[in-house]
């Protein structure tokens, strides 16, 4: 299930600073990224550069992206954050997330045509400089059918910190 982003003040901060975030992303090397750990969800091409994992700050990675880290740390209840890259012709199979306590936010940074995400019966496309917020405990899948990588800033945060936005 997707949520309207207008009620979430975090999206204003992320969207207005998207070029700063993208600039830090472009300074990273491919070797800085690692395979997404749940390899059963994809055949190839899903890589991540983590900043936070399950509430733990990844200090070395955060030092390479100081401005992005500051923005991420301003989000109440942050649990996970990092750059998520889908290589060309990659498909993440339908799956569900683990916790009803968190919501996910994707900020579009490098978005070629023919990329999308399906959440339940809804399908959306990422847009550069715009956020999508969703509950990943609803079955979802994502794809990049283009010949260029798709990269978003992925953030998971505790739902309880944003109850007023969910009504």
Which residues fall in each region the model found?
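Short, solvent-exposed loop/turn segments at secondary-structure junctions
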Residues: 88, 138-139, 158-160
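Conserved metal-binding segment of the jelly-roll/cupin
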Residues: 125-139
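Fe(II)/2-oxoglutarate oxygenase catalytic core
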Residues: 1-102, 112-115, 151, 163-167
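Short, surface-exposed charged micro-motifs
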Residues: 82, 106, 141
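A short beta-strand-loop-beta hairpin characteristic of the jelly-roll/cupin
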Residues: 109-128
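Short beta-strand His + acidic residue motifs that chelate non-heme Fe in jelly-roll/DSBH
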Residues: 92-95, 116-118, 134, 140-146
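A short hydrophobic beta-strand segment most commonly corresponding to one strand
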Residues: 104-108, 131-133, 148-164
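Residue-level recognition of conserved beta-strand positions in structured domain cores
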Residues: 85, 96, 119-121, 144, ...
């Amino acid at each position: 299930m997707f949520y309207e982003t207008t009620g979430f003040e975090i999206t204003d901060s992320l969207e207005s600073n998207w070029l700063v975030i993208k600039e830090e992303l472009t300074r990273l090397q491919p070797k800085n990224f690692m395979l997404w750990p749940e390899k059963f969800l994809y055949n190839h091409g899903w890589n991540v550069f983590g900043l936070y994992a399950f509430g733990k700050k990844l200090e070395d990675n955060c030092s390479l992206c100081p401005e992005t880290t500051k923005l991420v740390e301003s989000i109440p209840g942050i649990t996970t954050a990092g750059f998520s890259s889908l290589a060309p012709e990659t498909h993440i199979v339908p799956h569900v997330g683990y916790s009803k306590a968190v919501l996910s936010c994707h900020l579009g940074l490098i978005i070629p045509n023919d990329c999308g995400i399906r959440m339940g019966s809804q399908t959306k496309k990422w847009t550069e400089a715009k956020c999508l917020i969703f509950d990943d405990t609803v079955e979802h899948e994502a794809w990049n059918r283009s010949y260029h990588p798709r990269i978003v800033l992925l953030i998971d945060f505790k739902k309880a910190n944003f109850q007023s936005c969910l009504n």
